[in-house]
Amino acid sequence: YKNNYISRKPYVKLKLNGIKTQSKKKTITLEEFNMLIDRYKHPRRDKILESDNYIVALYIGLYTGIRISECLGLKREDVDLQKNIISINKQIQRVGTEIKETTLKSDASYRSLPISNELHDILEKHFKKYPESEYVVFDKDMNYMKSEKLRKSLARSCEKLGITFNYHMLRHMFITQLYNKGVDIKVAQSLAGHSSYQTTADIYTELDQEKTVN
């Protein structure tokens, strides 16, 4: 899409190997990602709304690399399908005993991200199917979805599929795509919303080392 930061079909064109630091798995393969998506595509009738939202949340993570709290904080007003821009300006997170909308973790977290053609189509269909919700990803009450709910569903699905996954891995997949495209570290830092240049640079260094080994 615009500026060619991300492959048009990253799940088809890119081959991603696991990135490991201190023996901890940091990403999943695109085959595993698609297995997870396919599992949510055939829900029970009473789980269709929830499954549709899990799918949208996963694709948003894949194509934008945003944090789970940022994804769940997205409202329709933050998504401009005419200009193909998503504005990241708030998040849903637990504060003490409450789960609520809050400001972002740092100034660098406030950013605007391009929407790929694939994500555009996914969001457009989602909005047409569920026109009544204020939030992009929502629960059965049309309110924001809690991160615990999404995490628990992903954990159950992954256990049944025999794969290890958490939502944060999508950030590594996204940054890996930027690396494979030759995107400058400073640009990748801005897109990922990292407050520290070193955070992004360390990931690029890991990918350099992995490339050398392979």
Which sequence ranges carry the predicted segments?
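Proline-centered turn/helix-capping motifs that create local helix->coil transitions or kinks
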Residues: 1-10, 83-84, 126-133
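Conserved tyrosine-mediated DNA breakage-rejoining catalytic core shared by Y-recombinases
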Residues: 16, 73-125
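Residue-level detector of conserved, well-ordered beta-strand and adjacent loop positions
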Residues: 15, 25, 29, 37, ...
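DNA/chromatin major-groove-contacting recognition/catalytic segments
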Residues: 12, 36, 97-101, 202, ...
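Catalytic-site neighborhood detector that most strongly recognizes the C-terminal catalytic loop/helix
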Residues: 27, 92, 192-214
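Helix-turn-helix-type domain boundary/helix-start signal
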Residues: 4, 26-27, 113, 168
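Short, basic (Lys/Arg/His-rich) helix/loop patches that form interaction surfaces
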Residues: 40-51, 64, 113, 129-136, ...
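Basic, Lys/Arg- and aromatic-enriched nucleic-acid-binding interface segment
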Residues: 6-8, 12-68, 72-74, 82
